[in-house]
C-alpha cells in the first residue's frame, strides 16, 4: 500500500502561508534542503490544490533550467543544487490537481480532478508505486485528514510568529492523535516534526 505524506512549512503560530499566500517568512536551511532533495526520490506522485499547483508550476516547471530567470520558491536569489534536484523530480512526477475552477492543466504528467473522492484516493494508494506527497494545499490536506488518508505529516516549523495568515488545519473538525516519528532541529532554528497517524484511525 502506497502512503500519502504531507509536507508543509509552518510558522510557530500555525500558519502555512501569509494572508496573501506569501511564503517570504520561510527560514531557508541548507541542511533541510539537502534532506528534501534526498527524500523527494521516495515519491512519484504529488497531490495539489489549485493555488499550490499554480505556484509550483510557475517556479518548479522551469527551475531545472540553468538559464531560467524564475525567482526562488521563497525568495529571489540563485537556486541551489538541491533546488535543481527537486525540480527534475517534480517535473517527472505524476501531478494530480484538485480544482473546481481550472479547465485544464498543462504541466508535464499533470491531470485534473474536479472533486476529491476518498474512494479514488484509496484506489490510488492501492496501486503499485512510490509514496504520494502533498505540499501546501490546505483544503486538500484538510479533506484527506478528515478521511484518514494521510499516513505521515511532515512539518518544518520556522522560528517566526506571523500574527495572521492561513491556518493549515482550519477545516479539520475531527480529532486525530499522532505518533512522533522524529523531531530534528536545524541550525537556522527550523524544526522538523514527523508524525504518523496513531493506530491509523481518526475519531
Q: Regions from the language model: what does each represent?
A:
Residues 1-149, 159-203:
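Portal/gating segments that form or line small-molecule/metal binding sites
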Amino acid at each position: 500500500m502506497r502512503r500519502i505524506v504531507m509536507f508543509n512549512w509552518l510558522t510557530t503560530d500555525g500558519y502555512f502561508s501569509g494572508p496573501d499566500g506569501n511564503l517570504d517568512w520561510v527560514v531557508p536551511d541548507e541542511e533541510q534542503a539537502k534532506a528534501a532533495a534526498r527524500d523527494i526520490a521516495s515519491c512519484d506522485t504529488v497531490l495539489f490544490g489549485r493555488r499550490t499547483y499554480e505556484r509550483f508550476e510557475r517556479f518548479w516547471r522551469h527551475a531545472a533550467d540553468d538559464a531560467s530567470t524564475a525567482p526562488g520558491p521563497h525568495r529571489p536569489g540563485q537556486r541551489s543544487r538541491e533546488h535543481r534536484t527537486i525540480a527534475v523530480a517534480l517535473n517527472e512526477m505524476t501531478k494530480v490537481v484538485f480544482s473546481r475552477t481550472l479547465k485544464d492543466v498543462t504541466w508535464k504528467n499533470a491531470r485534473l480532478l474536479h472533486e476529491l473522492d476518498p474512494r479514488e484516493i484509496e484506489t490510488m494508494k492501492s496501486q503499485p508505486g512510490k509514496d504520494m506527497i502533498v505540499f501546501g494545499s490546505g483544503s486538500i490536506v484538510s479533506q484527506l485528514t478528515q478521511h484518514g488518508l494521510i499516513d505521515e505529516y511532515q512539518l518544518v516549523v520556522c522560528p517566526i510568529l506571523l500574527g495572521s495568515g492561513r491556518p493549515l488545519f482550519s477545516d479539520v473538525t475531527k480529532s486525530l492523535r499522532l505518533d512522533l516519528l522524529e523531531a530534528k532541529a536545524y541550525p537556522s532554528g527550523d524544526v522538523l516534526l514527523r508524525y504518523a497517524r496513531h493506530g491509523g484511525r481518526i475519531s
